[in-house]
A protein has these predicted regions:
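Conserved catalytic cores of phosphodiester-cleaving nucleases, focusing on short active-site segments
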Residues: 46-52
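Non-catalytic C-terminal interaction segments of nucleic acid-processing enzymes
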Residues: 1-43, 57-153
Length: 153
């Protein structure tokens, strides 16, 4: 099995994933992907876009207008090219599904009262799934490499 990793992914931040793939005989080829971070060769029917934390996806969805628009452009592009996009949110808060997001507390609230909170984030995720055909998935950083392979198969 050969996995394509977007060349814009920072190599040193994904060593845990690379170690897992190496142990399991998964070859990793780095190349620029049109959308997302990971796909299987030769098909781009399924793509995984990884988020390093709940805070990152909260910024993508409820952060600045520019950040939100960039995220939506990526979702639309995946939809236009016929790829199923999985947004995989790595987290250590025990969040395993969108329903768990409702009880998530945004640590940025300490600095900004306007930041998106769990209930609004969960509602936005459901809306985005319905509108753009993507799926939000959740796992721990330790599970990410295996989850990426499972989603792409």
């Amino acid at each position: 099995m050969t996995l394509i990793e977007d060349s814009r992914q920072q190599k040193t931040k994904h060593e845990l994933k690379h170690a897992y793939w190496s142990e399991h005989g998964v070859r990793v080829f780095r190349s620029k992907l049109l959308v997302g971070d990971y796909a299987l060769m030769p098909s781009l029917a399924k793509i995984v876009d990884t988020k390093a934390s709940m805070a990152e996806i909260a910024q993508n969805i409820g952060g600045s207008r520019e950040e939100h628009q960039r995220f939506i452009r990526e979702l639309k592009l995946a939809q236009e090219v016929g790829s199923k996009l999985f947004v995989l949110v790595e987290n250590t808060e025990g969040i395993e599904c969108i329903e768990h997001v409702i009880s998530w507390h945004n640590p940025r609230e300490e600095y900004s009262a306007k930041c998106i909170q769990g209930p609004q984030l969960a509602k936005a995720m459901r809306t985005i799934e319905g509108r753009y055909g993507c799926m939000f998935m959740f796992c721990t950083p330790e599970e990410a490499a295996e989850t990426i392979i499972d989603l792409l198969r």
